[in-house]
């Protein structure tokens, strides 16, 4: 059976966009309390404009107890006071637009905070009450209901169920949470849940946001029977991952997005490796785009990377939607560190502390990966600090850690704090311009980060910041990145090469030795210094055809020794 190709989606700005992910708590602190905020972000918008990105995606900025970095939302229509006010958010959206930057915000629909009025009302109401119908409350198993209702496990470790206490002080029902106990899952079979989130979408679209990033987009729908995973037959629908009911939800959301004069964008966080299954979310009446997590997790190996790129382009092709590319985000090990290890892949199950890392090698590979990613067709998502080549901070003191993943694993998993350390902007010592002098950032910055600051890198043409600015600028200015057809060029073992139309050739060397480059081309940009005839180890280059040579003048590399071109 062959997958059916969907009609092509209209090509809006998101098809080729470079989107910069802002984790506001760690971006810039305007008031000196140690927490990044909207004042800091507004002051640093010129950095994003200079970088050349098309949009910024802001992770949750809503009212929240911050049990999971803001992904436990208490009020979807207000800004957390730690970040600022709703009025400031509206100013930010307008100021970004004036700089030709679109704003994408995060919506967290699978769950909300235990502090949300809905859940407070549910806890105050008795079992079987309408207030509890918006969640998954169930009696426990066992003689006294002392066992969880089923065998589901939290994504962060431990059971996916927490028991409540009734008004009389006795143990009560259990509620479902696929993440932390502070994040009860909503029941998307309840019409009030659907109506509420459709209203939330309109609330933010009305305020000028250009798009919505949908958190955990493939987890919302649950089998009403909540069966034990151990009883689900092989090949049967999963009780809470990638269920058929999801598509009706996103069709309704797409109708809302399409109702605005300049259609707004829906981008899904969807952890599905099957390209055909992923493509179903990208049909013309559902989501516009989805994150490419297979690419993020792929090791630094030419063959594996090519397989991942082919599968990703196939998924987009099936849905006639843009591919998307991401190397890092606020949940995963930073690229420089991951690429400096023996195992360069990423898997949540394999996250551990104390893995030997060669940061110099990781930096070379990360620079090459930046050019690879920015040359691919589709949209690119760039996590804050990647443009500075920041490594993972692996030596945070135990008392400084905040991530529930770390605590729920009893310290075995280092958690995600290491990729969330506040950005360095200027100066020679912490807080490195993150906040006013004397600011104590909410996570401590390494004392040796002075070379990573924006200030230091702006003065260094060999810095990661210069590389990103030049590459993003070329991507914006060259038509090949918008319209150039993608096709592989066979270039030998450990090398990937592809063309975008006839005007651009990208070559990536995954090996530890120099490799020859094709004749008749001029270097546009290289991740490492290039002599013109060869590409350095663990490096990438963008080439364009050279003008015709005059009589007796060679065109680039004329050597045929070991040259696959």
Question: Which residues make up each language-model segment?
Answer:
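Flexible, gly/pro- and Lys/Arg-enriched active-site loops
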Residues: 524
């Amino acid at each position: 059976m062959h997958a059916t190709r969907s009609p092509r989606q209209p090509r809006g700005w998101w098809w080729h966009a470079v989107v910069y992910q802002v984790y506001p708590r760690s971006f810039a602190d305007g008031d000196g309390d140690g927490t990044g905020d909207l004042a800091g972000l507004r002051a640093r918008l010129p950095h994003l404009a200079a970088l050349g990105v098309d949009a910024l995606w802001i992770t949750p900025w809503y009212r929240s107890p911050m049990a999971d970095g803001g992904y436990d939302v208490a009020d979807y229509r207000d800004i957390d006071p730690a970040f600022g006010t709703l009025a400031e958010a509206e100013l930010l959206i307008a100021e970004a637009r004036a700089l030709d930057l679109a704003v994408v915000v995060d919506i967290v629909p699978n769950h909300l905070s235990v502090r949300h009025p809905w859940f407070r009302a549910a806890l105050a109401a008795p079992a079987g009450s309408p207030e509890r119908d918006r969640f998954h409350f169930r009696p426990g198993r066992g003689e006294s209901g002392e066992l969880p209702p089923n065998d589901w496990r939290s994504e962060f470790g431990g059971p996916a169920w927490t028991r409540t206490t009734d008004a009389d002080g006795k143990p009560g029902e259990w509620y479902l949470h696929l993440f932390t106990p502070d994040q009860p899952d909503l029941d998307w079979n309840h019409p009030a849940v659907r109506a509420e989130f459709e209203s939330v979408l309109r609330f933010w679209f009305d305020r000028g946001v250009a798009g919505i990033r949908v958190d955990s987009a493939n987890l919302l729908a649950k089998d009403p029977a909540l069966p034990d995973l151990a009883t689900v037959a092989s090949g049967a629908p999963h009780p809470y991952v990638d269920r058929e009911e999801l598509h009706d939800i996103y069709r309704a959301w797409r109708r809302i997005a399409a109702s605005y004069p300049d259609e707004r964008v829906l981008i899904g966080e969807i952890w599905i490796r099957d390209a055909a299954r992923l493509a179903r979310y990208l049909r013309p009446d559902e989501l516009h785009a989805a994150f490419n997590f297979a690419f993020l997790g792929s090791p630094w190996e030419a063959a594996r990377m090519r397989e991942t790129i082919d599968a990703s382009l196939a998924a987009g092709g099936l849905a006639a939607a843009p591919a998307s590319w991401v190397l890092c985000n606020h949940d995963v090990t930073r690229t420089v560190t991951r690429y400096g290890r023996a195992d360069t892949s990423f898997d949540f199950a394999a996250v551990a502390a104390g893995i030997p890392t060669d940061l110099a090698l990781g930096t070379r590979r990360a620079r090459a990966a930046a050019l690879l990613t920015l040359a691919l067709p589709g949209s690119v998502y760039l996590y804050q600090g990647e443009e500075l080549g920041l490594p993972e901070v692996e030596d945070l003191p135990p008392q400084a850690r905040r991530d529930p993943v770390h605590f729920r694993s009893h310290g075995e998993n280092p958690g995600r704090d290491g990729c969330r350390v506040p950005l360095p902007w200027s100066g020679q010592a912490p807080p490195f311009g993150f906040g006013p002098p004397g600011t104590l950032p909410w996570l401590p910055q390494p004392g040796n980060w002075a070379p990573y600051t924006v200030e230091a890198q702006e003065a260094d043409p060999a810095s990661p910041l210069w590389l990103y600015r030049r590459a993003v600028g070329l991507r914006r200015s060259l038509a090949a990145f918008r319209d150039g057809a993608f096709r592989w060029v066979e270039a030998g073992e450990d090398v990937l090469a592809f063309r975008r139309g006839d005007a651009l050739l990208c070559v990536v060397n995954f090996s530890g030795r120099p490799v020859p480059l094709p004749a008749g081309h001029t270097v546009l940009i290289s991740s490492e210094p290039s002599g013109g005839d060869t590409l350095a180890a663990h490096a990438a280059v963008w080439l364009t055809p050279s003008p015709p040579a005059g009589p007796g003048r060679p065109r680039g590399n004329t050597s045929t020794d070991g040259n696959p071109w």
